[in-house]
Amino acid sequence: CNSKGTPCTNADECCGGKCAYNVWNCIGGGCSKTCGY
């Protein structure tokens, strides 16, 4: 599984079971989902 901070599309990719938008990834206009947030 992927560690916290790793880009993801689904929660089941992540060790912590969370895949969500992180506000810091939205700076510059392009939001991306990462594991663990």
Curated annotation (Swiss-Prot):
One of its GO terms (cellular component) is extracellular region. Keywords: Calcium channel impairing toxin, Disulfide bond, Ion channel impairing toxin, Knottin, Neurotoxin, Secreted, Toxin, Voltage-gated calcium channel impairing toxin, Voltage-gated sodium channel impairing toxin. GO terms for biological process: envenomation resulting in negative regulation of high voltage-gated calcium channel activity in another organism; envenomation resulting in negative regulation of low voltage-gated calcium channel activity in another organism; envenomation resulting in negative regulation of voltage-gated sodium channel activity in another organism; venom-mediated perturbation of transmission of nerve impulse in another organism. The keyword Secreted applies. It is found in: Secreted. InterPro entries: Spider_insecticidal_peptide. Expressed by the venom gland. Pfam families: Toxin_21. One of its GO terms (molecular function) is calcium channel regulator activity. Disulfide bonds join C1-C15, C8-C19, C14-C35, C26-C31. Its main location: secreted. The keyword Secreted applies. The presence of a 'disulfide through disulfide knot' structurally defines this protein as a knottin. Negative results: does not modulate the activity of delayed-rectifier, 'A-type' or BKCa potassium channels. The recombinant mu-cyrtautoxin-As1a potently and voltage-independently blocks voltage-gated sodium channels (Nav) of insects. It acts by pluging the outer vestibule of the channel. It acts in combination with a weak (30%) voltage-independent block of insect voltage-gated calcium (Cav) channels (low-voltage and high-voltage channels). Tested on DUM neurons, it inhibits sodium currents with an IC(50) of 540 nM (and a Hill coefficient >1, reflecting an incomplete block at higher concentrations). In vivo, it induces flaccid paralysis in adult Australian sheep blowfly Lucilia cuprina. Belongs to the neurotoxin 13 (insecticidal toxin ABC) family. 01 (Aps III) subfamily. This is Mu-cyrtautoxin-As1a.
